[in-house]
């Protein structure tokens, strides 16, 4: 990577932006171990620069929560959510609240707590203003839920929806932005 040797020359905010994008790149490749390393690197960078209570740190921690979920580290995922969710609620950040609920749903499904998962999803948030990348993440966890509860028709429908999105121009443009 040509950027890596020049990272130290960037401002702390730009370094965080770069490392966050790197973590997102790995996340969308389903490479959760490297995504984890990237987001932990971002967290350490922000801590070293006294940026503990910034949007960048909360963004880092919500991303860590999702990565921990995908690595099966449910306690770590929950701890990260418990730390960031009050901040996003206080800010009225509906996109981040949607993402927190998505991760909480994923944790409940992964832990086999289907009644809790159903309760979380009973809140029908309007996702028309939510970036589709986050809707797609929610759909991934909903597919798992439907598979585990035996509703294969709904799981299959969501899979087809995700495939259509992943083949779309919007998705390709999103990947190009992430790769940059």
Pin down the residues of each PLM region.
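Residue register of alpha-helical TPR repeats
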Residues: 17, 55-59, 99, 137
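Residue signature of alpha-solenoid helical repeat architecture, marking inter-repeat boundaries
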Residues: 13, 53-55, 95, 132-133
């Amino acid at each position: 990577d040509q950027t890596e040797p020049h990272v130290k020359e960037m401002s702390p905010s730009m370094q965080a932006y770069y490392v966050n994008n790197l973590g997102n790149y790995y996340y969308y490749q389903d490479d959760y171990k490297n995504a984890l390393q990237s987001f932990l690197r971002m967290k350490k960078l922000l801590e070293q620069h006294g940026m503990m209570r910034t949007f960048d740190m909360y963004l880092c921690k919500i991303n860590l929560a999702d990565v921990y979920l995908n690595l099966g580290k449910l306690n770590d995922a929950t701890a990260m959510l418990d730390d960031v969710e009050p901040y996003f609620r206080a800010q009225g950040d509906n996109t981040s609240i949607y993402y927190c609920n998505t991760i909480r749903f994923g944790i409940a499904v992964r832990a086999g707590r289907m009644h809790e998962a159903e309760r979380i999803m009973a809140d029908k948030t309007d996702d028309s203003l939510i970036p589709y990348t986050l809707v797609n993440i929610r759909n991934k966890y909903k597919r798992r839920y439907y598979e585990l509860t035996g509703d294969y028709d709904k799981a299959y429908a969501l899979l087809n929806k995700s495939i259509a999105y992943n083949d779309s121009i919007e998705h390709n443009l999103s990947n190009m932005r992430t790769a940059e």
